[in-house]
């Protein structure tokens, strides 16, 4: 069974050009499905029936997985069997009459402008090369709304401080050129002037990566999560994640009067409906409501609304 799973994952990478993170999620979902089938004494894909897939769905629900997780795993199984039937490995798709579960779409959490300012000021209370780097990362993350995977993938030549722009490669290789505000530009300048060379000494070879760990290697997503967790604990923000900063960027942009389409382009959303969920949020959704955005939040991108549309490079 594993052989077919590996063939499917190669298909996702080579023919559908999915990202490594998406493929890793498919792998996790299908490995859990395989484990479930083995528990039912099933070891060949052509032996899997509609009832087996339905039992897997019921098992996920009984184990109280989030509706979004259940929907994702069912979608992975359905895609996998579409692949198997298309290759003639199985004759009949057992997922044909399995409906994708409805997902309860929770409103994303966003920080207040005051909480954002407190977070962005925290690293330099005890400046070290690492914390100067952290300051630059947090400023850039909030100023652009990039995903954490996009942040850690940035290279030095993606940053243009003369134009105050950052070139970002998003999902499916889509490129966005994003304006950055003065706070982010200053933090990046200080990182380049003070910290990056010191961090790079930890490695025996040069690297084009923008953000480096203490060994001089490219910082990973997991590494950034651990850094953010440390600052979250210092501020008492137990549920702070990288995506909360992305949500905060979107909410504060919209609350400051930016056009929905402009924010969609900045975030790299392919569908406007994904961006529209942020219109249901305002600063009252946080514990410390504000009538107006704080100064840093109000200049989130350092540009006026009509300048915010970011053309996608072909």
UniProtKB/Swiss-Prot annotation:
Entry keywords, A to Z: Cell cycle, Cell division, Chromosome partition, Cytoplasm, DNA integration, DNA recombination, DNA-binding
PROSITE patterns in alphabetical order: CB, TYR_RECOMBINASE
Predominant cellular place of this UniProt entry's protein: cytoplasm
A Pfam family the protein falls into: Phage_int_SAM_1
GO cellular-component term (any): cytoplasm
Residue ranges with Basic and acidic residues bias: 302-314
Annotated Core-binding (CB) domain residues: 1-85
Listed GO MF terms: DNA binding; tyrosine-based site-specific recombinase activity
All residue ranges annotated as the Tyr recombinase domain in the record: 106-291
GO terms (BP aspect): cell division; chromosome segregation; DNA transposition
Catalytic residues (UniProt): 147, 171, 243, 246, 269, 278
Superkingdom of origin: Bacteria
Start and end residues of each stretch annotated as Disordered: 284-314
Coiled-coil ranges per UniProt: none
Subcellular location: Cytoplasm
Subunit field text: Forms a cyclic heterotetrameric complex composed of two molecules of XerC and two molecules of XerD.
Role this protein plays: Site-specific tyrosine recombinase, which acts by catalyzing the cutting and rejoining of the recombining DNA molecules. The XerC-XerD complex is essential to convert dimers of the bacterial chromosome into monomers to permit their segregation at cell division. It also contributes to the segregational stability of plasmids.
Entry's family note: Belongs to the 'phage' integrase family. XerC subfamily.
Protein name per its UniProtKB record: Tyrosine recombinase XerC
Originating organism: Roseiflexus castenholzii (strain DSM 13941 / HLO8)
